[in-house]
Amino acid sequence: MTENYQLLPEWAQQDAVMLAWPDKSTDWQPWLSEVKSVYLKIIEALNQANTNVVLLVRSSEISDCLDRLKKSQKVLIVSADYNDTWIRDYGFLSCANESGLQPVEFIFNGWGQKFDASKDNKINQNVLSRLCQQPIKSFDLVAEGGALEIDQNGLLLSTELCLTNPKRNGGKSIDSYQKDFQQFLGAKQSIILQNGHLEGDDTDGHIDTLVRFTPNSGLVIQSAFNRPDDSHFQGLAALVKECQQHMPSHEIFELPLPYIVNPQGERLPASYANFLISNQHILCPIYQQPEDKLAIQIMQNAYPEFSIVPINCLPLVQQFGSLHCISMQIPCGILKPEVLQSFNNGVSVYE
């Protein structure tokens, strides 16, 4: 980008977080009651962090949603039609330069044409753009928000397994991706990691399930140090080593790995690294597992200046994702003033 915009790190001050409400027409149907409860707890936690919520809701579900929310909650309901609720991967990203902020979007094709994404891919231009001060800039590249992690210095992380899936961008090379990340997102350096993948992950190894930055040159890594006999142990140990080699000056915090299977015996990709940072708070997924307590302790060590807020995400991981996957932050300076003003009125529906 000639304007020298750079993708903002997640800990940049936020006006809001966007979510897409689960309903019976999504894949959440078997766990709908439990999943809605998780969303309501996330909304409550975000409001306590002084973060507003932009909530996409199908028009037929708005009445039910209003009944479940407290009238005083700072939530703006926006009518939208979407394929799925994983808004991390199709919601717009936010870049900034000295002049201001710029929302940007990539093409979303259902994680390499695995699932229909025709509705999700239109959400930014058809729905969310109405809330933004600037038009949402579109890039001719298939990419997902969960595949990108950046710090305040412009160091960007992604994973080779995800980027090289030929159903995303054909045979596009890593070198070509790195040039695009520099041009589109202002990345000063892009490290594409070769190791790490969780069983049951449909995304081909999104970085937000594996490695996250801290503001103090730290790396929080989903490891399996507590399970040396686990099928993930070698791959995640190699990921830790790879991060040490690429970023030797970073302090590393390894998270334990829980073991969760669904009733069909499938391993679920439960990751403690799939947390959401919002205004000096971190909403940290827990899974009602023995490892939860240790994971929270490690998170507090990694982010000493943040309040760690545990959220039970066991219902979310039944659909092979977690907390970060269902959310996307909106930094201060993106939303129109009248949109921000609407949050002061409690729950409202955007007209």
PLM region descriptions:
Residues M1-E351:
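The feature marks the mature, well-folded catalytic cores of soluble enzymes
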